[in-house]
Design a protein with these regions (language model features):
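Nucleotide-sugar donor-binding/catalytic module of glycosyltransferases
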Residues: 1-133
Length: 133
């Protein structure tokens, strides 16, 4: 199936962060999204958390996991994402990032409004307790 947007995320030893990050991606207001996760063979329970979330989330059926044979690092994981994304647009986020529920919708609307091939958004630093700095 061809999607409008692919949200891609590498997974490697991010157990403390991956649930909040993945849920922020899955809970987007934009509908036509493929989720592409690259299992970069970490040694913690990150992938157990990922499998639990996608088994229960309504958008879990839109998640594709690519298993690396062994840990290859962030750059290799990103190359795998680019090579395997089926969306017209690709949004790469790290597995400790959290995006607002309307992030993809806003970025998509701006891309269409200005007829551009690439767009970047701003960010803010925030602790896991919610403090912004």
């Amino acid at each position: 199936m061809k999607y409008t947007v692919t949200i891609a995320m590498p997974i490697y030893n991010v157990a403390p962060y991956v649930e909040k990050s993945l849920l922020s991606a899955l809970n987007q207001t934009f509908v036509d999204i493929e989720y592409l996760l690259v299992d970069d063979k970490g040694t913690d329970e990150s992938m157990d958390i990922v499998h639990r979330i996608i088994s229960m989330h309504p958008r879990g059926k839109n998640v594709r996991i690519i298993d690396q044979k062994y840990n290859q690092g962030t750059a290799a994981a990103r190359n795998v994402m680019v090579a395997n994304a089926t969306g017209e647009y690709l949004f790469i986020m790290d597995s400790d990032d959290v995006i607002s529920p309307d992030c993809i919708d806003i970025l998509y609307q701006k891309m269409k409004q200005y007829s551009v091939d690439f767009i970047a958004g701003s960010f803010q630093r925030q602790t896991w307790d919610g403090d912004i700095y």
